[in-house]
Amino acid sequence: MSFDLPVPVLLAIMRLNERGHEAYAVGGCVRDLLRGVTPNDYDICVSCTPQETHVVFAGERVIDTGIQHGTVTVLLGGMALEITTFRADGEYLDGRHPASVRFTRSLREDLRRRDFTVNAMAYHPVTGIVDLYEGEKDLKKRLIRCVGDPEQRLTEDALRILRAVRFASQLNFDIDGDTARTMHRLRDRLHLVSRERTAAELIRATAESGAVPALGEFSDVVFAALPDFPPLAWISGLKALSHLPAGDATLRMAALLHDCGEPALQNTLDSLRQSRAFREEVLALCRQARQPFAPDETAVMLAMLGEVQLRRLVRLQQAAGVLDEKESAQRLARIRAALAADLPLSLRDLPVNGKDLTAMGLAGEEVGDTLHTIHQMVLRGRLPCDRAAIIAWLTRQKK
């Protein structure tokens, strides 16, 4: 079996081979090639040390991205190629990282340390696939299975428990029975892993098309990673998630959390340790999830949330059963109409400003309060977005 590798990947492997080093495409890119999917990136494993890799690619830009683990990044032909020395990991003392890394000349040793069989295959454009752990067979069976003993693999790095869930969600695969049983048994080891690492895997798992069956089967694993998540909100969260397309991590996380209630919602979001923008967007969606907005509030909601967030809210409310399909379509149509009307979605867009109000005799907080009132009236269609009309209204109010 052969694949059309990108030219920079082929060139890198050829240059390494010409210097007497073994080199293979490895891991997720091989898995994706076998599935007929174009890989997002290509990793290369090699028999030479990082220092020898530097020599091979003298004249190219080489970045020491993880040299202590044998990894350098070579910029070649417009691609960033991670090139990593074959290695064997030492003992994992903290359930997260190997205490030591030993470079080796053996591809077999390198593949043996990897997490799952579907990620433990290598490919050379001349000699073909190297598959020591039946990864291709598991791909055909649509199965996530640990390399070797699942107890050892999952004890080494507890994050692999969530990685298995994420791969099952991403690939729409099942998880091998022995691997699954070990995941359930070792779930409490997730406390050894940083919140940032667990959150990244959970968010990616939630965003994928196979999230509902994967998360549903391993709810105990999710609760171990998110101890503040109230179990009573779990079923409605999965149900809402099942009605949404894959891809939008913000919307799909909001669907999963929308019934949590306070303070569990805030605590769970805080525990994810994500960006402030992500937390605030999910929080806003969850808090509005059960409150459909009235027709004359469309522009107000658009000004408050923005177009992307308001469209998300409508989709979330439909997924949660608050709106039916017809009601959802009507609200999306209102959003389009409000955008086409070119309404002032911020105070800056009004045809009057604070100086105008000050010139009319307003002062202090009254200026801001009045601008806000004008903005709300314009958005609700109760006052034209016209300078003369607004000045006339203000004049009447002063009498």
Residue ranges and their predicted role:
Residues 1-399:
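Catalytic cores of the polymerase beta-like nucleotidyltransferase superfamily
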